[in-house]
Amino acid sequence: MSDDKTSPMGLFKKYLTNRRIFKNREVLRHNYRPQILPHRKPQIDEIASILAPALTNETPSNILIYGKTGTGKTASVRYVGTELENASALAGTKCKIVHLNCEVIDTQYRVLAQIANGLDNADEHPSDSTRSHIPMTGWPTDQVYMELKNQLESSGGVMVIILDEIDKLVKKSGDDTLYNLTRINSDLKFAKVSIIGISNDLRFTDFLDPRVLSSLSEEEIVFPPYNAPQLCDILQQRAEMAFVEGALDETVIPLCAALAAQEHGDARRALDLLRVSGELADRENASGVAEKHVRMAQEKIETDSMVECISTLPTQSKAVLYAMLILEQMGKRIFTSGEVTVVYREIARIIDLDVLTHRRITDLISELNMLGVINTRVISRGRYGRTKEMWFDAATSKIEEVVTRDPRLDDERLKKLDVNRLRAMFR
């Protein structure tokens, strides 16, 4: 235990004395709402033009907004929503915005209850838990719908309902929620509802009834990925608020932007790279943030993302991954799908796991490749046909640590697996 008791700050003193890096790191976080959104004026103007009828108490068209992660969809919609509420206050009309995160609020009951309970203070508090007026469970859904309708009627005006990550709601609960919301205007006399759906997944509309899709997608807006120069502008804007003047080497922002541009133009990734670079420089008490800190940040973020990804895999996928780890421990840097299948079957037999077919194992290998956990390539073996080879791109100690957290794979019997017998099989 440390005996650093020389000041009230004790253990933390050395981490608080270096003020050469950050001025306000919070502006680099995803939940920060900038006053200016670079390179999104066309999309913001389009959303505003669609919602403008709300200011004259008319019903705006419903909007579906698409785009990859980190393309400014949510920030732009929130910005327009705030401006709409401000303009409505000046115009003497009533416009309310309610923003729901459908990754959290992913059932019809919770969506309807959240909207109804949030009408009085629709956008003043986070919308990640059901409010107090309607119980979290217990009412029939049609009663919740009726309560929402009554609340809307008594409130009057125009309500814009933003369903962020709408695809998560549809995939979990179907399209009943959207069916009810898109037809609610026909049940209202004194209020009007407009829906904005935000999605990273263009294909989620395949799950929708054609009538729902037709009502929901009256207007569609696509947010393209940012390119490297655009990401530079975004980072420069935030860096001026986040960092002490002169703390960043001139190569840092262009490098963060270039790396994030390779990741589908993701502004969140660019901001994470810049923030983590600064944090690493801060922790080592450096005088500034250099290119090496960006490289270190990239490696750290990729490792953290991989750990999270692997930890959520089903046991069968982890068993396939564990088979690859065993092959690597046997000295094989590159291994085939056939070899993975042999070792996987040994693992499945030992821990009483249902044995998958070779075809299904190949599918799981493709998924691991798509997630970036492994690399694969298909090679031709002439008259013997084609096979898939795979290998790990980085050190596997962290991967093994995460895989063996699964109780089924943290099995003493697996530690006694006869590796020599397996080696003999592959000679």
From Swiss-Prot:
Top-level lineage group: Archaea
Record keywords, A-Z: ATP-binding, DNA replication, Nucleotide-binding
Record: residues binding ATP: T71, G72, K73, T74, A75, Y226, R238
InterPro entries listed in its UniProt record: AAA+_ATPase, AAA_22, Cdc6_C, Cdc6_lid, ORC1/CDC6, Orc1/Cdc6_arc, P-loop_NTPase, WH-like_DNA-bd_sf
Intrachain S-S bonds: none
A biological-process GO annotation: DNA replication
GO molecular function, one term: ATP binding
Function: Involved in regulation of DNA replication.
Family: Belongs to the CDC6/cdc18 family.
Protein name: ORC1-type DNA replication protein
Record gene name: cdc6
